[in-house]
Amino acid sequence: MEPKEATGKENMVTKKKNLAFLRSRLYMLERRKTDTVVESSVSGDHSGTLRRSQSDRTEYNQKLQEKMTPQGECSVAETLTPEEEHHMKRMMAKREKIIKELIQTEKDYLNDLELCVREVVQPLRNKKTDRLDVDSLFSNIESVHQISAKLLSLLEEATTDVEPAMQVIGEVFLQIKGPLEDIYKIYCYHHDEAHSILESYEKEEELKEHLSHCIQSLKKIYMQEGKPNLLDMGSLMIKPIQRVMKYPLLLCELRNSTPPSHPDYRALDDAFAAVKDINVNINELKRRKDLVLKYKKNDEDESLKDKLSKLNIHSISKKSKRVTNHLKILTRGESQVKDNTFNREEKLFRALEKTVRLCVKNISLCLQHIQDAMPLALQSVMDLQEISYNKDDEMDYSETLSNALNSCHDFASHLQRLILTPLSALLSLFPGPHKLIQKRYDKLLDCNSYLQRSTGEESDLAKKEYEALNAQLVEELQAFNQAARKILLNCLCSFITLLRDLMLVAQQAYSTLVPMPLLVSSISEIQNQVLEEIQNLNCVKENSATFIERKLSFEKKKPVQILPEMPHQTDIHRSKLLSTYSAEELYQAKRKCNATQEYDINLLEGDLVAVIEQKDPLGSTSRWLVDTGNVKGYVYSSFLKPYNPAKMQKVDAENRFCDDDFENISLFVSSRPASDSVTGTSESSIGDSSSSLSGTCGKFETNGTDVDSFQEVDEQIFYAVHAFQARSDHELSLQEYQRVHILRFCDLSGNKEWWLAEAQGQKGYVPANYLGKMTYA
């Protein structure tokens, strides 16, 4: 027996070596390129499948036998004992019966699917009842029918006109396992929902009557064909689930009935593992769905009794462990399992939620503002039309205005329908995934807790629940984020399009009202002309010199225009003035005066000038037209004093107190800080356009006490040279000679022409050249 056993083992090794060579060249792969194919004449709905002709099958069978018989059957015949040969024959006979059962049951199953589609699904769809959702009831039953027809076709092709010893069934299932799993996953995933929908339909008489009519017609066909009687619609809907669960049983039995030396044994082993994995994956998918439905249930749906029933020692212990593990993770005392894919999708999910919420809020506010502003804008247009109304113009703009108002209403309705409604519906879908994400984190904490303590059933259960919930979230969050992003982008594009259309309507209406659009330069010229006309009015002439336009804090400071430098006054110029003008017309500059406006001139302290006119073109008496003997221009009168050489010394002695005390009081102080402007020399006097106040000594009473107190005054104390009326809440009104305390020598933008002052408890901005520094000798 030992030589025979050794020979048998060698033959087994030889067969295993040849199996890899033969498997890829069996009934499907070894075909000639010139094989003739004909349509199957088998009756049934799968008649469109392609089959080999009889001559090609015979030739293919002969070639397969030539390859396997010399190396297989001869060797087996030499080594097998009569008992083993008898056992193998029994196994082959049983194998043949199982293959026939597999094919026959697949035919019956396919026939049931055909009847279901023809007698139930199609008639219900043709009724087009709104309350009857056929797709939700039967899911992808047509796809199940197609994959069953394909499987049956491949099984028949692998067995027809092929010797039982040469039939390979495992390769058929390996070839079709991918589509088989995808299709049955969808059907099994929706079966529970379909069953619930069926129960709800059976409660409505009209829908129940439609379903009963289809079932009765189907029962008649079953009775005519001699099949077992169909119980109800539920038993018909569960057939695909029963069938996919039966494939592993049939393949397992077929593998056990196949000799190990048979070329189909290894393929059957792989096919059995494949269909078993299909069932495991389907069950896992269903379990994941059940977990999602369990944790997705809103707390509002639970009664107080249900919530109290969950409160027990186990739940309290579990929650306390979660808190402990969470604190450990926060303090980095314990590592956490990370899923980068989930973290990325969760981050995108939260960003999308925030974006959608802000879009709903901001677009709603935008719509509200547009609706509020449109009537006001139309009223302004009508007022401007009335102002610019020309009697010769007989055009009627009422139609244009009504069209603009209608466009606003259309904009609001389209915005609500195309943007706000979809975004609001999308926003309402975020709480469900939020709750599942939180549950997923809880399950992760449970999993970490059990893994640290034990590896028992509780640990395995916690790990399975976490992995199931995590896999479900990763899969569905990707689909949800992709769909949410697409909806969001479409809504934003629609919003931009609606705004563009509204602006185009407004532009067309404007072009109708104003045929020729004005250029920016033309608008500036018109504005300047209007301002000049306003300044010529008597009511504004007096205040035109003190009119100062305050610059806002966010505006950039305009560059100061550099005026051309003028030559200094010489003795020749003085002689010319003395010989040309009378003594009453001659004045002398009390201090240096710099030009601040157009047509102003610069003066040095002691320069002699002749006053030509004691007002400027706008009628202001604060600026005089003077002649220096070299040039003519405007100078502020406060910088000048009468010229009288005979009384100069006497006037200086009499006015020593007044002039010395107020010589350094600047009417138009510089924008420089006080620290730079405390000297009394002409070169360092305060401001580029400073002046002293003459003839005001009598308005100030001085004694020893007052002088001492004034000397103790902070250097930040100034007084108002001119009265200033505030034009906004940010400015401070001042009376003439009113004392003010300077808080800051510039505004928020750094503009030193406006100072922040405080007077009588009020704060505000004041023009710098309206203030004078209070200094005393």
UniProtKB/Swiss-Prot annotation:
Residue ranges occupied by any BAR domain in the UniProt entry: 327-536
TM ranges: none
Domain DH: 94-285
Bias kind Low complexity: ranges: 679-694
Keywords carried by this UniProt record: Guanine-nucleotide releasing factor, Phosphoprotein, Repeat, SH3 domain
Pfam families: BAR, RhoGEF, SH3_2, SH3_9
PANTHER family per the UniProt record, alphabetical: NUCLEAR FUSION PROTEIN FUS2, RHO GUANINE NUCLEOTIDE EXCHANGE FACTOR 38
Protein name: Rho guanine nucleotide exchange factor 38
Species assigned in the record: Homo sapiens
Phylogenetic classification of the source organism: Eukaryota, Metazoa, Chordata, Craniata, Vertebrata
Gene: ARHGEF38
